[in-house]
Amino acid sequence: MPGQITAFDIGECMVKAACFTGGKLKKVMAKELPDNMVSGGEIVSMDAMADFIKEMAKENGISRGAAAVILPGTLVFTRNVTVPAMTDGQLLYNLPFEFKDYLTQEKNKYYFDYAVQDTVKDEEGNVKELQLFVCATLKSTVEEYRAMLRRAGFNLKVAMPEECAYAALTEDLSLIHI
């Protein structure tokens, strides 16, 4: 079905999934993991996790297709930074330098992304600085998750750090008037 995506949060002892169609939540589920499937936030066996997710999807009648996954904090570098105003292209070029003290491999082995949290303007209203949430993760990490989800019958479309998932959730909740 168009506009359908299933989001997975793979924790230490449970996998949680939420199915969305057209941006609306349709179904949520959670299933306890067998012992030793995840250790220190990292999946021990991608093949075993793929089989677990495939079975979970089957048990809950989840249509296979587009998927999103929350990457554990142990696999993603994140920072809040302030930079001078610049274009998207300039930002993407400069992001690796924000992580120079943290990266353990060549910068071409990482995906980098950012979200603008706020802008600082001068007296004339021109953007002077950007306050950003920036992140980096190894390309091999994303490819491991892509292969795992493919084995389970899903097509990875979004991989995000847990901080972004929580930020998106709180942003959505702020739109609800209680």
State each model region's role:
Residues 1-102, 143, 173-174:
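Non-catalytic, solvent-exposed interaction/assembly segments
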Residues 71-172:
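Active-site neighborhood for divalent-cation/phosphate handling
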Residues 176-178:
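Conserved small/polar residues in nucleotide/adenosyl-binding loops
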